[in-house]
Structure formats: C-alpha cells, structure tokens
C-alpha cells in the first residue's frame, strides 16, 4: 500500500464580507452554521485588510458578498478575501455573489468599450475562486465568462408565489418591461397561468439611464399588471413602463425585481409613482433613504442556503428549480 488515507470528513465554512452582513447571517442560520469570525477594516488611505480568525485548511469554503454601493470597494474586498482563502489552503472556494456587479456591461455596444462583466469573472478566477453561485444574472451569457462552474439561482418562485397568493389571478397580466425580459415574463405566465403583455421602450444611447417608452403590446385595460425585471436601479425604466400601463387602462401595477439597487433618484421615483407595491428580494440591502411603505422585501437566504448544501454534498442545484 502506498500513500496515506485520512478519515477526516468534509468541512463547510461560511465567510462573509462587510457589504451585506444581514443576508450572510440569515444564510448561516438557514444552514445551521456560524459565520467564520473575520477581522476586516480599512486603512487610512482606503486599503482593505482582511484576516480570518479560524483555519480554513482543507475546508470547502463559501464566501458571500453582494456587490452593493460602493460597488468597487466591495468587489475589491471580495477579491482580497478570495486571495486570503487560497493562501490559507482551502480545499475549494465557492464565491456567492447574490448580486453580480458590472453585469450590465456584458458586451460591447460600441467600439472601444470594455466587457466589464467578463473582467470581474476573470478577477475572481485569478484571485482563487473555483465556483460562482449567483442569483438572476442580468444576461445568461455571463455564466460563460467564468472558467469554472457557475450555479445560477432564480428568485422567480419566491416572487411569483408571493404575487399569486395576494392577487386575484383571473385579473392578472404579467408584463415584460422590454423585449429582453420576455422569456422570464413567459415563465411567470406559465407559473401563474396569466396572459403576457410587453412594454416597448427605446433608450437614448448617449444619455445614461434615459428611457423613452413607446407602446404596450397586449391587453392591460382593467387588469392588475405585474411588471417583472431583474433589477431596479434609478427606477426610470420601470416607472415609465408603469405610467404607460396606466395610460392604457391598467387597474393597478405591481413591480417585482430580484435586485433592488435603488440608486440616485430611485427613492423619489418609487415614492411618487402610482405603482401600488414594489417587491424585491434581499440580495442587496435596502438604502436607508428609501421609503419602505410601498416596498416588500422577500428573503433569498433559504434559496442560497439550499444551493450551498447541494454544492457541498455534491448534489444537484438544478433540481432545486426543476421541482418548481
């Protein structure tokens, strides 16, 4: 006999950056584990220091960090933590990115532009990530940017079941805010047995976050319309889409999105909108300035925790959604 056999069992360790500790703590609670104590702070010049207070040698490590504002700081912190885990001899490192930063920069729209979503994936791989686990990427092709497995989770079951339980389904119409979201909206229609409508929009390519809404395709008159999107950033697109639906006779509009980015003028736009309710998951923390009266936040932690367990136990993440 050659070599050495060990009797040690696999060990799961969960680490968190400082961007969204509430979500990390809830994921840990769902898994029945504690977060690994971590010392992290900023030096006077803005550099980030990280040190884990427990050994990660030989462990299957899961590092959770959502890319919220200030996004560049938290992306960098995650990369530094990845490097620390790699140098600590972790057996495997899975990066949990509930909201994947730079996802909208997934292709070149014009010459001399970067593909920043690919750059983020390359940086994670170089820093030490073996696997990425994320929720509702802006576009599916981002999964191919990372040189390794990518587990793509979906918030649709959580959001759709919430809406379906509170709205008379006979009056429900699912609305895609643009042509790019039609496939997702179609899955909503299948789940809730509801018709589909589409808001056709056109962006001004020279002005960031500027949207002009043109027309509504489908019957929305007298209907409770549910606008479905992956993220709400400044709120311009979705509020303009809601206005178009009301102008075409919608009885009510509910907005759902996985990621509530809510930057800049979003707080005022949501507050002043005729939309009755905005429904998000907690992939990102809700900014303090946002009025919560019209906002419902659903927990994505159980979904992430189940996926982590499947990865750790060499199970199937896909099966979590095939059953639904």
Listing of model-derived features with the role each one plays in the protein:
Residues 1-324:
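PRPP-associated nucleotide enzymes
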């Amino acid at each position: 006999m050659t070599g050495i056999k060990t009797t040690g069992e696999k060990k799961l360790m969960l680490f968190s950056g400082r961007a969204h500790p509430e979500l990390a703590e809830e994921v840990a609670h769902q898994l029945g584990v504690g977060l690994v104590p971590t010392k992290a702070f900023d030096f006077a010049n803005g550099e980030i220091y990280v040190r884990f207070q427990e050994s990660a040698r030989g462990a299957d490590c899961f590092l959770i960090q959502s890319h919220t504002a200030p996004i560049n700081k938290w992306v960098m912190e995650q990369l530094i933590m990845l490097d620390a885990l790699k140098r600590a001899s972790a057996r495997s490192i899975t990066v949990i990115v509930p909201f994947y930063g730079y996802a909208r920069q997934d292709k070149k729209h014009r010459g001399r532009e970067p593909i920043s979503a690919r750059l983020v994936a390359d940086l994670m791989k170089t820093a030490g990530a073996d696997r990425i686990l994320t929720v509702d990427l802006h576009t599916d092709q981002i999964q191919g940017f990372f040189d390794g497995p990518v587990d793509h989770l979906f918030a649709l079951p959580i959001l759709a079941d919430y809406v379906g339980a509170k709205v008379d389904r006979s009056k429900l119409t699912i609305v895609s805010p643009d042509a790019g979201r039609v496939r997702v909206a179609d899955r909503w229609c299948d789940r809730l047995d509801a018709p589909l409508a589409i808001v056709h929009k056109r962006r001004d390519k020279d002005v960031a976050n500027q949207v002009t809404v043109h027309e509504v395709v489908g019957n929305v008159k007298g209907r409770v319309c549910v606008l479905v999107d992956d993220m709400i950033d400044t709120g311009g697109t979705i509020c303009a889409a809601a206005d178009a639906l009301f102008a075409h006779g919608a009885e009510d509009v509910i907005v759902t999105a996985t990621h509530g980015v809510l930057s800049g003028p979003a707080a005022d736009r949501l507050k002043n909108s005729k939309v009755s309710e905005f429904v998000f998951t907690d992939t990102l923390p809700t900014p303090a300035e946002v009025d919560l009266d019209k906002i419902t936040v659903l927990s994505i932690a159980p979904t992430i925790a189940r996926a982590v367990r499947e990865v750790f136990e060499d199970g199937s993440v896909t099966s979590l959604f095939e059953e639904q």
